[in-house]
């Protein structure tokens, strides 16, 4: 029976991993579809936002055949492709930490119900439109290799701020400039790891580590929802660091 139990555990773990992988692929495909719409073209060569969405999907090992199948549908007028709309939910986590939740959904009622349930289960509260959005500002973020040449190029191209994180350099830009700067960095031979437009907190909230963990459990539960693409928070990252 012990052997049977061991294999049952492995099977359950594999099933859980397969489910998580399936969700990741689905989220990337939705992001590709949204990028095609937002960037104005279903053709990657004419849409830098779409190209970057595809690159992000490939970095997470989304099968190229899945991507190509979706692109063919979009390039054929979208027939057969799911129609998603972006919805933003605003609310508070325990400790008064603000959350912005971005979802792509084909069913508003289902998504709202799931998001509300997660907030309630983890001690948060779902707010109304505008209740926390004012605490964030849109920023472009380009993550690239951290070299002196990359730093000089980023400044020359109009970066708002630079943040060194080991081998990576995070370049903050105006939201409308992120993709232009990323492409210009690539043209200068700089290796770009990621580019996106995010909601950046204007101020952060510091909490004791145990309270910060409650916030992160809420964030992770929201991110596990199929329809949720991004969760932004104004929790101070240092709140998650436990002193040795």
Swiss-Prot record:
GO cellular component: cytosol
GO terms under biological process: regulation of DNA-templated transcription
Main location: cytoplasm
Compartments (UniProt record): Cytoplasm
Taxonomic superkingdom: Bacteria
Any one GO MF annotation of this record: DNA binding
Keywords per UniProt: Cytoplasm, DNA-binding, Transcription, Transcription regulation
InterPro entries, A to Z: Integrase-like_N, TACO1_YebC-like_2nd/3rd_dom, TACO1_YebC_N, Transcrip_reg_TACO1-like, Transcrip_reg_TACO1-like_dom3, YebC-like
Short name of any one Pfam family annotated for the protein: TACO1_YebC_N
Keyword Amino-acid biosynthesis: no
Keyword DNA-binding carried by entry: yes
Family: Belongs to the TACO1 family.
PANTHER family xrefs: TRANSCRIPTIONAL REGULATORY PROTEIN YEBC-RELATED (PTHR12532:SF6), TRANSLATIONAL ACTIVATOR OF CYTOCHROME C OXIDASE 1 (PTHR12532)
Name under which the protein is recorded: Probable transcriptional regulatory protein TTHA0821
Species, as recorded: Thermus thermophilus (strain ATCC 27634 / DSM 579 / HB8)
Lineage, highest ranks first: Bacteria, Thermotogati, Deinococcota, Deinococci, Thermales
